[in-house]
Every structure is written in C-alpha cells, then in structure tokens.
C-alpha cells in the first residue's frame, strides 16, 4: 500500500471517485489506473535493475583491477623466482669451474720424538729418590 494512507483514507478516495466519475465509468477507470500502476512499477523495477547492474559492474571493475594487481604481483614473484634460478645456475657453473676445496682437517700436534737415551733426561730420575750430590758430600 501507499505509505501514510490507511484503509479509511482509501475508502474516502473510492467514494469520491464513485461520486465524481460515476458507477458506469468507474470499473474502466480502475482498470486503466491498475494498468498505469503496473507500468509504473515495471519502470521502477527496470530503473532499480539498471542501478543494480551499474553497481554490480562497478564491483566487477574493482575485482578485475584487484585481480590484475595480483597478477602483476605474481609476475614480479615469478620474475624473482626466475632470477633466483638463474643465480643458482651461475653459482653452480662457477663452482664447477673453480671448486672450493674444503680446508684441510686440523691435525693434532705430533707427539715429541723420542730422544736418544744419551740426550734424554733420566726417566727414572723423576720417580727415584734424589741421589747424593758428590760435590756436596754425603751428610746423612
């Protein structure tokens, strides 16, 4: 129904139309009025649908732009991946041409060579009690 018009107002309008138009032409007038209202509603629906299409198209344009931006960022990502692959290829080629040998393993220091018995200090002197010094004399 129309906003702000209740049943009593419609009844009053109907009575006024009956008096002004007359009972003979009132049904034809009501039918024409109904057809006009139907056409008006169809036009309003088409108008609303056109606005909805424009809004939907605007949203689609935004989505297309976002997709295009994502594709461009994916292009940059794929370019970075390609660059990393080329770098790996170059590094492997350089390593084949000039291999880097690992540093030689650290060797533990060699144990001291055994000295000949004449040059070596007496091994027994470390464990043996001190001998008497002939220069000092034996004062035991």
From Swiss-Prot:
Topology of the protein relative to the lipid bilayer: Single-pass membrane protein
Subcellular localization(s) per the UniProt record: Cell inner membrane
UniProt keyword terms in alphabetical order: Cell inner membrane, Cell membrane, Membrane, Protein transport, Translocation, Transmembrane, Transmembrane helix, Transport
Family annotation (Gene3D superfamilies): 1.20.5.3310
InterPro entries given in the database record: TatA/B/E, TatB
Task of the protein: Part of the twin-arginine translocation (Tat) system that transports large folded proteins containing a characteristic twin-arginine motif in their signal peptide across membranes. Together with TatC, TatB is part of a receptor directly interacting with Tat signal peptides. TatB may form an oligomeric binding site that transiently accommodates folded Tat precursor proteins before their translocation.
Similarity comment: Belongs to the TatB family.
Protein name: Sec-independent protein translocase protein TatB
Gene that specifies this protein: tatB
């Amino acid at each position: 129904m129309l906003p702000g018009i209740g049943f009593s107002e419609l009844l009053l309008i109907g009575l006024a139309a009956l008096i002004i138009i007359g009972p003979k032409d009132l049904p034809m007038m009501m039918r024409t009025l109904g057809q006009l209202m139907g056409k008006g509603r169809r036009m309003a629906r088409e108008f609303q649908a056109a606005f909805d299409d424009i809004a939907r198209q605007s949203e689609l344009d935004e989505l297309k732009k976002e997709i295009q931006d994502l594709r461009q960022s994916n292009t940059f990502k794929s370019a970075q991946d390609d660059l990393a692959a080329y770098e790996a290829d170059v590094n492997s080629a350089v390593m084949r041409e000039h291999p880097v040998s690992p540093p030689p393993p650290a060797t533990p220091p060699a144990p001291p060579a055994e000295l000949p018995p004449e040059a070596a200090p007496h091994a027994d002197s470390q464990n043996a009690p001190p001998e008497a010094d002939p220069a000092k004399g034996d004062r035991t």
